[in-house]
From Swiss-Prot:
GO molecular function, one term: metal ion binding
Catalysed reactions, as listed in the record: 5-phospho-beta-D-ribosylamine + glycine + ATP = N(1)-(5-phospho-beta-D-ribosyl)glycinamide + ADP + phosphate + H(+)
GO biological process: 'de novo' IMP biosynthetic process; purine nucleobase biosynthetic process
Residues binding ATP: 134-190
Name used for this protein in its record: Phosphoribosylamine--glycine ligase
Cofactor note: Binds 1 Mg(2+) or Mn(2+) ion per subunit.
The enzyme's E.C. designation: 6.3.4.13
Entry keyword set: ATP-binding, Ligase, Magnesium, Manganese, Metal-binding, Nucleotide-binding, Purine biosynthesis
Keyword hit for Metal-binding: yes
Gene label: purD
Binding annotation for Mg(2+): E279, N281
Amino acid sequence: MKILVIGSGGREHALAKKFMESPQVEEVFVAPGNSGMEKDGIQIVDISELSNDKLVKFAQNQNIGLTFVGPETALMNGVVDAFIKAELPIFGPNKMAAELEGSKDFAKSIMKKYGVPTADYATFDSLEPALAYLDEKGVPLVIKADGLAAGKGVTVAFDIETAKSALADIFSGSQGKVVIEEFLDGEEFSLFSFIHDGKIYPMPIAQDHKRAFDGDKGPNTGGMGAYSPVLHISKEVVNEALEKVVKPTVAGMIEEGKSFTGVLYAGLILTEDGVKTIEFNARFGDPETQVVLPRLKSDLAQAIIDILAGNEPTLEWLESGVTLGVVVAAEGYPSQAKLGLILPEIPEGLNVYYAGVSKNENNQLISSGGRVYLVSETGEDVKSTQKLLYEKLDKLENDGFFYRHDIGSRAI
């Protein structure tokens, strides 16, 4: 069987790598992919993730047995709808269901309607009433652009000036709507589930690190590292999240005529009042995918085929140890990342997922985005895995790049 993964980052590299482990998979294509993936024998295809017609044609010509969608932009662009219309097997939500991520306001309205615990909020489509609400509520508050913002459309404001500036930025840009939420304090974690026809197959939870610098300092990013599982979040808490968040949301989407197929990401926070929902994503997270998927012992391709066919999938996960991943980013990220930096030589035996990379005229891998690659390691516990991973990472010639030195420290 041939598989097509849509997307170009570290998440898609992790998906492609996992699919290649399947004995029934002969070839894995990634569109558009990146040059780093070729080291693993993955075929990269020069088709944009937003070119639905070309992707459909490629899948037909290559007789692709399964397509898996990575990024939210492709989902919101209706790639799943295009494949379904062409009667091609694809795993991901259609455009209507992807609205759970595509609009923060829509997601909040679903949570409110179906009793899913989340922060109190208000939505505004112009600046003046939003500023008035700000004055009324005071800080801290969380300000979110309604639409897709590549993981960077959220500002946690602890002072009024930051809040006003965030609102001004959102309304002066392409976003015409903003959600203002109460600030929730607690321990954040990510719960991914495979979903189809109302059936839910949860994965081990992960915790990612959004801030750019050590000690959770600096601006928000798409994620600077992650680890899985999160042992200080109990099984009881995870069950509470499934019962109170994932199940009613999946059932609610069916009720709304927007049945969800694909990977549902619940961004959660354990507060003094129990689990609350921060956000939903309609796909795997990045970098969490790179630490969750290596823990799957079963055949991912077969599991997805079974889920789509309505059969019970085999999903067995590593029961001990921890998988840790650290993102290496180009200096200047998340605002103006340096492009064209030559990547260090990666020694054999280092598990790497490439993201923002391309090749120069000398066939060397160079940085072409903010988050450049992720190095992962699996070990007995967070502390020993951290030590192992950072010893290897610190030996690399990472001039012009930076990474956090404390990924996983919350678990120690």
